[in-house]
UniProtKB/Swiss-Prot annotation:
It comes from Nicotiana tabacum. It is a single-pass membrane protein. Its main location: plastid. Belongs to the Y3IP1/CEST family. This is Ycf3-interacting protein 1, chloroplastic.
């Protein structure tokens, strides 16, 4: 078995190639096969060349400093993109903020009410787009519009330009945006108070309506100055008379029967 083995010595590795793997032994054993007659010095040299070439290829190293620098540059570019929004986006944001301010001043609408209104979609518009065949599946949804409105309320510029544009168009088309809401009139007498003569206690009215004492006093004065709906000539006498008819008829029947029994 020892006669069938050939030992080859490899040249020592250079100390400059520090990245090459360390070889524990410089001797490799080549087994002989049954085709011994074809073995030659040229074959040994070829095998030795291939072996040395395979061992000379060290592991592939990645420069971590270059990768970290490239990643940092990419993050800086993204931050610059976020810090420099599109001028058209800034214009849409200013329009939406203006509409929100008008709704709060003229309609007394809070931000939650405006957001809820934006999230509700008109079924007529959905049916119209479906019939006309202009319904786009990739168009921004109502949730996207509400998210964009939430970002604008927080002082941010939405990144979704399509949702921002659609939101600005809807906010600008809000009906009667410049018209102020009509103010409520002073509280007057209720229908129950007008139908009864119990009157209104100013203190109780001030507590229930949460108004000042002067306003409650005005309600009491108006209650006293109003004319009654029922004329004083009739009053409740007609009601008592109608209610007494059954009693009068019953007493008359009893008297007639008693008179007939005496005869």
């Amino acid at each position: 078995m020892a006669s069938n083995m050939l030992q080859l010595s490899l040249p020592p590795l250079s100390s400059s190639s520090s990245s090459l793997p360390f070889l524990s032994s410089s001797v490799y054993v080549l087994p002989f096969t049954h085709q011994r007659r074809h073995f030659s010095f040229f074959n040994v040299q070829n095998y030795r060349f291939r072996l040395s070439r395979s061992t000379s290829l060290g592991p592939l190293f990645v420069n971590k400093e270059e990768d970290s620098a490239t990643y940092a540059v990419t993050e800086e570019e993204e931050d610059n993109d976020d810090d420099d929004p599109d001028p058209q986006s800034l214009e849409y944001v200013s329009q939406i903020k203006r509409v929100l301010e008008l709704l709060k001043r003229n309609r007394d609408m809070l931000f939650g009410e405006v957001k809820l209104t934006i999230m509700i979609e008109d079924p007529r518009d959905v049916e119209r787009r479906r019939l006309l065949g202009i319904d786009d599946e990739n168009a921004p949804t109502r949730d996207d519009l509400a998210a964009a409105l939430e970002e604008i309320n927080e002082g941010k510029v939405p990144k979704d330009f399509a949702a921002l544009q659609m939101l600005a168009e809807e906010m600008n088309s809000w009906p009667n945006l410049e018209v102020e809401a009509t103010k409520q009139n002073k509280p007057g007498r209720s229908l129950y108070a007008k139908a009864t003569d119990t009157g209104i206690d100013p203190k109780e009215a001030a507590k229930r309506l949460k108004i000042d004492w002067d306003s409650a006093a005005e309600i009491d004065e108006s209650a006293e100055s109003d004319e009654p709906d029922v004329p004083p000539a009739l009053g409740y006498g007609a009601l008592y008379l109608v209610s007494a008819f059954p009693i009068i008829i019953g007493i008359s029947v009893v008297l007639i029967l008693f008179y007939n029994s005496l005869q």
